[in-house]
Amino acid sequence: MAIEGVLNEGFVTTTADKLINWTRTGSLWPMTFGLACCAVEMMHAGASRYDLDRFGVVFRPSPRQSDVMIVAGTLCNKMAPALRKVYDQMAEPRWVISMGSCANGGGYYHYSYSVVRGCDRIVPVDVYVPGCPPTAEALIYGIIQLQAKIRRTNTIARKG
């Protein structure tokens, strides 16, 4: 039976990659790693006005239950090992959103002796959300960009 015949019969055809990535994008569970004022905007995005639940985003308190980490705020040298430890406790696949100028590159405190100049020096970052602090809309846009990135990835390894 040709593909046209399958579609006429009411069947939907897809690849396993697209199906798995579709389910992953519809249920992103971020673990909040709020370090400074950007965390207030992150909480604002989760409240009723913006309602991240409509994107399938449900904040989780444990790294073992989450697949996205949102680093929001200034990362200090003393907090960097804790960030890496929490990241290592997350199950694969896992993604990181760096939220705000301080998390992206040190921000206002860039030249301070105690500030890590970007959380990408500690964990790999998938999406950067700029701003000081970024608005809730900017965080939502970053989550949408992460969903688009997940849809483009190959989930099942192909042997070539």
From Swiss-Prot:
Its EC number is 7.1.1.-. It is a peripheral membrane protein. GO terms for molecular function: 4 iron, 4 sulfur cluster binding; iron ion binding; NADH dehydrogenase (ubiquinone) activity; NADH:ubiquinone reductase (non-electrogenic) activity; quinone binding. [4Fe-4S] cluster binds at C37, C38, C102, C132. Its cofactor is [4Fe-4S] cluster. It catalyses: a quinone + NADH + 5 H(+)(in) = a quinol + NAD(+) + 4 H(+)(out). InterPro entries: NADH_UbQ_OxRdtase-like_20kDa (IPR006137), NADH_UQ_OxRdtase_20Kd_su (IPR006138). Pfam families: Oxidored_q6. GO terms for biological process: aerobic respiration; electron transport coupled proton transport. Keywords: 4Fe-4S, Cell inner membrane, Cell membrane, Iron, Iron-sulfur, Membrane, Metal-binding, NAD, Quinone, Translocase, Transport, Ubiquinone. Transmembrane segments: none annotated. It is found in: Cell inner membrane. One of its GO terms (cellular component) is respiratory chain complex I. The keyword Cell membrane applies. Binds 1 [4Fe-4S] cluster. NDH-1 shuttles electrons from NADH, via FMN and iron-sulfur (Fe-S) centers, to quinones in the respiratory chain. Couples the redox reaction to proton translocation (for every two electrons transferred, four hydrogen ions are translocated across the cytoplasmic membrane), and thus conserves the redox energy in a proton gradient. Belongs to the complex I 20 kDa subunit family. PANTHER family: NADH DEHYDROGENASE, NADH DEHYDROGENASE [UBIQUINONE] IRON-SULFUR PROTEIN 7, MITOCHONDRIAL. This is NADH-quinone oxidoreductase subunit B. It comes from Ralstonia nicotianae (strain ATCC BAA-1114 / GMI1000) (Ralstonia solanacearum). The lineage of its organism: Bacteria, Pseudomonadati, Pseudomonadota, Betaproteobacteria, Burkholderiales.
